Amino acid sequence: MGTGMERREFLKLMGIGGVVFVSGLGPLAHAAGEKGTKDDFFFVQLSDTHIGFSDPKVNPDFAGTLKKAVAQVNSLSIQPDFIMFTGDLSHTTDDSKERRKRLQGFRDIVADLKVKTVRFMPGEHDAALDNGEAFQEFFGATHYTFAHKGVNFIVIDNVSDPTGSIGDVQLQWLAGELQKLDKDARIVVFTHRPLFDLAPTWDWATRDGAKAIELLMPYKNVVVFYGHIHQVHNQMTGHIPHHAAHGLMYPLPAPLSQPKKAPVPWDPAAPYKNLGFRGIDAKVLKADYVITEFPVKKG
């Protein structure tokens, strides 16, 4: 498993609103502004909002950061076809009533989004202590599929099992869903944890993630978007790119860059540093995904 990306597979550019990446195997003309087709579309990924977290040393605006992100999404000049939240909607709590209160608080905030199609998946903070019971009460299934303009989306739950596994039953479901697709189908996978072993000692891995990757490998056009690690990170497993997103409550340090994983303290000189969301412009015919990172704005 290599950590680098060849130029043909991964190109970093500077773009309006943040850093733009081109993810995919198609020609790089998209990055230079090639005209899109009628089937191209745009969606937004937000992650790790951690409603219920309340340490002002880490984020003094813990009650307002998600609201700022919602306002920024609403102000985008092109509204997305849909929005995806990739887990840790709430911050962990042992109290089942408090867990539901936090999930309700999250839902109340995101109800202000202009876009009507908003999808959700759990993180371990939402689901690991009750196998996803509370999450399902508010948002429905923890794993599912949907299709949009020729792209097949697969949402994998690797958090409801407290061992950090997908589990045999869900892997069988995944195999069945993939069998319905042609080998050159456009496939986008959403997970919370990384499917590969990024930093297992920090819980940045999925115990049986290699089995999911093995099922995906025969398909030519697959990309994975995930959260959990609270930072942008890009890695290839074979021909499959995996893209981690910024969080919206606090950043975390680079993988294994210090003895223990802990939130990065708030920097008053650079408020909201490394907090943000991303837009993904899907170029369907050539299976490219142009990723724009949007930092949270003060005010």
Where in the sequence are the language-model features?
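N-terminal export signals
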Residues: 1-4, 9-31
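N-terminal active-site segment of His-dependent metallophosphoesterases
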Residues: 13, 30-100, 183, 198
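Extended active-site neighborhood of metal-dependent phosphoesterases/phosphodiesterases
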Residues: 35, 95-186, 208-223, 235-287
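Active-site neighborhood of phospho(di)ester-bond hydrolases with catalytic His/Asp-centered motifs
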Residues: 46-47, 83-87, 118-124, 190-191, ...
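Solvent-exposed loop/turn segments at secondary-structure junctions
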Residues: 49-52, 89-92, 124-128, 159-162, ...
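Short acidic, glycine-rich surface-loop motifs adjacent to enzyme active sites
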Residues: 182-198
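A contiguous binding-surface segment within folded domains or other stable secondary-structure elements
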Residues: 199-211
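C-terminal/domain-terminus segments
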Residues: 291-299
